[in-house]
Amino acid sequence: MAFGNEAFPIVLLCSLWYAISSSNNVIGKKILLDFPYPVTVAMVHLLSTALYLSPTLHVWNIPRMHSIPKSTFVKLILPLSFGKAFSSIASHVSIWKVPVSYAHTVKATMPVFTVILSRFVLGESQTKEVYCSLIPVVGGVMVATATEVSFDMIGLLSALMATFTFAIQNIYTKKAMRDLRLNHLRLLQLMAIVGSAMLLPFWALCDLRRIIIVIQSGEQEMLWLLVILTINGFLNFAQNIVAFTVLSIVTPLSYSVAASMKRILVITVSVVLLRNPVGVVNVLGMLVAIFGVFLYNKAKYEANRRKHELPIVTKHPPMENNIKNNHIHYHLV
């Protein structure tokens, strides 16, 4: 009975996570098909994150942020915020140009970029199992790309750029939380605020005039568009919060399984509802890539577990553990 009581909230949260993520991706694609302004959609997502996190952090009683030195802000926060804005734009361009199913398959290459960047930026080497897990990831994405009916080079490059930027953010977010001793949600809020401010002039230059022309022409039902953009922004925020909550009550390995299942469901729902054409080999490539991501997460989990079993004494283990957990949260979402 106790097991049932513990399992019920996990199943409920995972179901909610899957439903929100699938809905958000389908709605996002629909918006970009009718309203092809990915910079505007990215701006809405950043503003929504900044806006909705304020009451959330207050309710959860997350400690307030202390003052950040100007040099640290310039060297760390500004690049991270720029990366968040850029990756959001690139991600939405990819969703606009290619099917959701294919964009999500390309984003499965995140472990490849993470391993390469960790090696050259941090000097970290991985276990043989981790390197081997990258083979199905790369192979699956290559098969999916070769057989993608609605292939678009801009969409592919945008998805790769978004994934590459996410990988860089994962590495430097760890450094930011270690150096600044910030809660990961406080850092996320700060990045969203600064990223919105950085994106504002580019948005005004790129989209504002064209949107005004569309409004004046009466081509779009603006009230409905504002409503659907607001819903999309809230769903994006809710998706991240639910994902953080799931990881806080399950092991990283269990989370990786849940995340892999979520990606499969998002791809399936998008194929069914958006009716983008896929072939058997194309689907096989997607599944192989997702399975490779699961193998990567499992290999990393085992490597970290073995590392923690070694008799290493550190001066501040609680803080280091906290930072590590925060990094895992950010990386997996």
Which ranges hold each PLM region?
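Polytopic endomembrane small-metabolite transporters, centered on the Drug/Metabolite Transporter
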Residues: 1-333
